[in-house]
Amino acid sequence: MEYKKTLNMPKSGFPMRAGLPKREPEMLRYWEQLDLYNELLKKNEGKPLFSLHDGPPFSNGALHMGHALNKALKDFINRSYAMRGYYTPYIPGWDNHGMPIESAIIKQNKLNHKAMSVAEFRSACHQFADHYIDVQREGFKRMGVVADWDHPYKTMDPGFEAREVRVFGQMYKNGHIYKGLKPVYWCPHDETALAEAEIEYQDDPCTTVYVKFPMNDDLGKLPHLDKSKLSFVIWTTTIWTLPGNLAIALHPDESYAVVKAPNGEMYIMAEALTEKVMGIGGFDRYEIVETHPGSFYENMLASHPFLPKTSRLVLADYVTMDSGTGCVHTAPGFGADDYQTCLRYGMDMVVPVDDQGRHTDYAGKYAGMKTEESNPVILQDMKEAGSLFASQEIVHSYPHCWRCKKPIIFRATPQWFCSVESFKDDAIAACEDVRWVPSWGKDRLRSMVLERTDWCISRQRRWGLPIPVFYCKDCGKPICTDETIDAIAGLFEKKGSNAWFEMEAEDMLPEGFTCPHCGKSAGFEKESDTLDGWFDSGSTHYAAMERDQGFWPATMYIEGLDQYRGWFQSSLLVAVGALGRGAPFKECLTHGWTVDGQGRAMHKSLGNGMDPAEIFNKYGADLLRLWAGSSDYHVDVRCSDDIFKQLSQNYLKFRNTAKFCLDNLTGFDPEQLVAAADMQELDRWAVTRLNSLIRRVFDSYDAYEFHAVSHAINDFCVVDLSSFYFDIIKDRLYCDGENSLSRRSAQTALFLILDAMTRMFAPILAFTCEEIWLAMPHRSADDSRSVLFNCMVQPYEDYALPEDAMDRWARIAAVRSAVNGALEQARADKTIGKSLEAEVDVTVPAEDAFLADMDADTLADLLIVSQVRVTVGDALTVTVAPAQGVKCARCWKVLTSVGTVAGHDTLCPRCAAVVKSLPVVE
């Protein structure tokens, strides 16, 4: 007889090879036919709400690994909440306006954008943005992200624009928006103001200079000193700003020394910095003639080093003694502190640089030069004039534009601002009501809000939402009222914001409208600037989430670390400043950057980038999801081909675990689970270990520690199942009677394990777990259409073993490990071949004496040997010898009982009984 046919051999239609690149698109089609997103909402309708508000990516390019990490984490969160009984609407969004789109379309199409009409340019931008929305959407769908992809929000949609106009109007009405001449970050290349979040710092070489400003008027306070030899020494790293100097700032309470050099010249500088500065000037000998507090010099005048004007001595508390000379070069057109200080002293604003970064006529001979071109010329002029005290070549961190990557300048221009100071305390207080992950996020955002100046919200661009303000041609004052806001919002709702550029001001305003300031109706002009893109995205919680979905605040925001300065902050400021509410999110979670395998930023120039589309085609989306779900995203997340190859091995361990369960559950009815009292203790041990895994996974999902979920499931598959439990139960599964209690006991454990693991891992391994779910048997209460329609299971407490029993199994595992080591050595010594050819003698210490009382056949099965003897001694020892008896032709155990059942000379009694119970086998 061919006894192989009498075995319960593993069989299922679940393939060992994943073939994810081919299989996943089939699953996507299945989900589309199922209408997965809407069916999920129907399934959980009426349950507690979990709302993750999507931070909108720019629609200006294909997916990159940062996009993939972000959307994967969002999908993990939404799926895990859905499977824990929450209603999880998720509307994806895109940020469409601003420089990223303009720069991309100009670069791609090589357009002379200044020669295009506004309508032509905006139409091109709109088409470009729409194209990349489609590109990115298809990439996110390929990842398996569950969302309302047919109804995303877009910041360029007319409805969104209309609502954003109302946000602006409310913030204006609240007194938080004004127009003023103040220094802002300015990009000369793109000719626009920039927000702080649009600045990147790079290390640049630079010439730093120490410059002499000769004393001009000492107010009669220093009659004993020769004024012709007395100078204040300032220090700067931006030579080009010197033509704009109007003042020198000193700290009122610090001591300032008059220092006499061997050449007879005298220099005024902070006493605390004298040794350092004089050393830089090449003086190892000098004399401190006298000292005075900074306040002593207030309102004195110094002569400009190379222009025919004076510089006033002013006081400022921000002057520090950690660098420079303690005498701070002050140019109100180029610095926020400088501006405020000069404003306090009633000095006029001077901005000697134009939109393109060229000096104006105010700068004299340097007029027409770009700022970077003027640096060496000014330096040479100061050398020739004898006004250069010293210079040094250094490398310093300097701000650059995030789009064009070129250096920016700080320049005073007329701009629209949001006065953050007026509601800063409320914004900071709102942070207290938020759960921050990680916890230090609260302090980071609080400190940024605390330190920030007023928010420059205007941009000199054409592709953006127009600032909805009119100007009266008669009195010149700006107009923004409830009436005008209602008119513009209604117009944009119907025609979009292009109407602003296509219609005359009078045609947009209500009939008979008059200026609220002067009462005239002679005519009106439109504001030409557009809103900062951060105002767009900062308004999404109102313009998209609340108005479209009907809830506020969001349960969660999750974005990269840079969004403390960007979207998190702009959303908070809009919520507090415009709506008068708290934070627009209850929880705020952040993740790190994606970097290459060596921890470097990924750049085209380095050739170290990874394309999500290539990963889909080579490994499958589930491997990309596993990468995101196995990484500690609180720090920078590394990605490389080697990392994905290693993840493939981890993936196969889980897949093979699932396949083992599925193969051995063929024909099993989950409605007929074996009761705990009837299960073998080993099977209850496996379920008890599963219970521990369930608790760890639930805790990890609650903490958004997805890497802990992945690692815990991987460890369970490798350590508890593959290396221990599965090996032991194979004999029972294959050789015991198909419907025997012993086999059904093991199948019950396998079902509970597979069912729980598939549900727990489904938020991360979405495609594979769905494939498993569709292949496995189910209970009648389950929704067999999708694993996502089912809740994660709670621990099976009825099956749990008590703690003392689990301790006993830990000792059994330790003994088994020692036996395995001895078996390996015996195989190496050619004493035995397979472990079933062995007989082992085990000596155990007194604390393991319970092993001597165990049924010998049961213990032999646990150790996967044919025979075992246990004695109690001083320490654990194992001796291996060939088993005595005959090899069973069916189960391959070597036993003395083989052939003792009549008619079955080559079988052991167990196998003989099983074969006798079967129908006749040919």
What annotation goes with each model-predicted range?
Residues 187, 401, 472, 515-518, ...:
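Short cysteine-rich clusters marking metal-coordination/redox-active sites
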Residues 191, 460, 476, 519, ...:
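Cys/His-coordinated zinc-binding microdomains
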Residues 312, 345-357, 461-463, 486-636:
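Alpha-helical recognition segments enriched in aromatics with Gly/Pro capping
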Residues 184, 398, 467-469, 512, ...:
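Residues immediately within or flanking Cys/His clusters that coordinate Zn2+
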Residues 2-20, 26, 30-34, 106-243, ...:
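Residue patterns forming the tRNA-binding/recognition surfaces of aminoacyl-tRNA synthetases
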